[in-house]
Amino acid sequence: IVTGGHEVASHDYYHGLTAGADPAGSKQALEKLTGQTVTGYRAPRLAAVSAATLAAAGYKYDSSINPTWIPTRYNNLRAPRSVSHRDRLAIYPVSVSAPFRVRLFWISLHVMPLPLYKQLCRSALHRDGHLNLYFHPWEFSGRLKDPAFGVPGYLSHCSGPALQDKFTRLLEWLKSRGCRFTTTREYLGYDE
């Protein structure tokens, strides 16, 4: 991953909500494994983690804010859409559409028709000048349709090769619009 020009950032040591969170331990383990300084953090399920805690652990940025509303999860409608700073930490939120802050997170690509998803990405690019999207490797697995995994149909119907194709078409469209792909570390100016 590192030799391919990709950034390794932390998703914590544990994937619980906040109980057992260990951003410092995760950072140390990843740095030992990769030989690279880990500057970024994104909490599991985009849970709230104190900026002071992350800064004290040595992180430079947090990308755990989804500036939208998700019932029973969080209401971040008043959170900034673009980079802000708190406790010596850059806060780089996940992208949402403009003006209505429709979520552009991983589930959206599964369930939305690609033309609609692209239109929402276009609105975010126009408003914010960047896209900060995230996906999980397991989403691209063809095994999600296996009932043993218990993945809901609304996610598994567009997974594996179907999601790979949709994602490839999204990337090609973004490239055709002149979008530049980079690491978050580079975008925020923390490149080593």
Could you tell me what each predicted segment is?
Residues 101-111:
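Surface-exposed cleft-lining segments at the edges of enzyme active sites
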